[in-house]
């Protein structure tokens, strides 16, 4: 049964890929590979949008889709498992027409609805956004501090972080405040993670003291 389900999902993705990529035959691979059904849909969409030079347009449209699906009335009907699939398909078809989305985005949304996979929509959008971020050379970085940073410190921090990037890469910085770390900061840039928080230092000191005494 599991193999049949996977086979079915593969056929759905191939169907979508064929519908949006035609008449282009060769798949354009995204700059990063994302696994799972969401990654497959996003890859097919990325390939088609890249071929048609509509990556940025599709990205904006998907962000709009994400906003619409969060609206209470829409979520109550579109994401409700008890609403008939045919009703969802009609509602989404009307929505994509009203928003004047490109055929690429419209085909994706309609196919997800027809295949009963609307719950995967946020994951597909997230996967596509990740592909676009890497496409632009963006390097995600999050910095967590115990208290807000002043402008001078933030500017200095950005300068230091940018010095670790390669040529052509763009820093995409997110600064968070978490009083529980007590002081210092926690930095995550790309796949690297550095914990310089006072909380962690105290925990290390505590463990060292227990080993001694």
From Swiss-Prot:
A motif (SIFI-degron) lies at residues 5-23. PROSITE patterns: ATPASE_DELTA. InterPro entries: ATP_synth_OSCP/delta_N_sf, ATPase_OSCP/d_CS, ATPase_OSCP/dsu. One of its GO terms (cellular component) is proton-transporting ATP synthase complex. The modification N6-acetyllysine is found at residues 54, 60, 70, 73, 100, 158, 162, 172, 176, 192. GO terms for biological process: proton motive force-driven mitochondrial ATP synthesis. Component of the ATP synthase complex composed at least of ATP5F1A/subunit alpha, ATP5F1B/subunit beta, ATP5MC1/subunit c (homooctomer), MT-ATP6/subunit a, MT-ATP8/subunit 8, ATP5ME/subunit e, ATP5MF/subunit f, ATP5MG/subunit g, ATP5MK/subunit k, ATP5MJ/subunit j, ATP5F1C/subunit gamma, ATP5F1D/subunit delta, ATP5F1E/subunit epsilon, ATP5PF/subunit F6, ATP5PB/subunit b, ATP5PD/subunit d, ATP5PO/subunit OSCP. This is ATP synthase peripheral stalk subunit OSCP, mitochondrial. It comes from Sus scrofa.
């Amino acid at each position: 049964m599991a193999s049949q389900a996977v086979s079915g999902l593969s056929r759905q993705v191939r169907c979508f890929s064929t519908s949006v990529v035609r008449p282009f035959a060769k798949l354009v691979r995204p700059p990063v590979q994302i696994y799972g059904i969401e990654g497959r849909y996003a890859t097919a969409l990325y390939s088609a949008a890249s071929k048609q030079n509509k990556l940025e347009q599709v990205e904006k449209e998907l962000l709009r889709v994400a906003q619409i699906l969060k609206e209470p009335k829409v979520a109550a009907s579109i994401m409700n498992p008890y609403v008939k699939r045919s009703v969802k398909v009609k509602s989404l078809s009307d929505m994509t027409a009203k928003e004047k989305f490109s055929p690429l985005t419209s085909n994706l949304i309609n196919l997800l609805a027809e295949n009963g996979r609307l719950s995967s929509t946020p994951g597909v959008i997230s996967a596509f956004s990740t592909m676009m971020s890497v496409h632009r050379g963006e390097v995600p970085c999050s910095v967590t501090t115990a208290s807000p940073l002043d402008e001078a410190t933030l500017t200095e921090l950005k300068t230091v972080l940018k010095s670790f990037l390669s040529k052509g890469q763009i820093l995409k910085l997110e600064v968070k405040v978490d009083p529980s770390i007590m002081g210092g900061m926690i930095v995550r840039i790309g796949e690297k993670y550095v914990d310089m928080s006072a909380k962690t230092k105290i925990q290390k000191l505590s463990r060292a003291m227990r080993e001694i005494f």
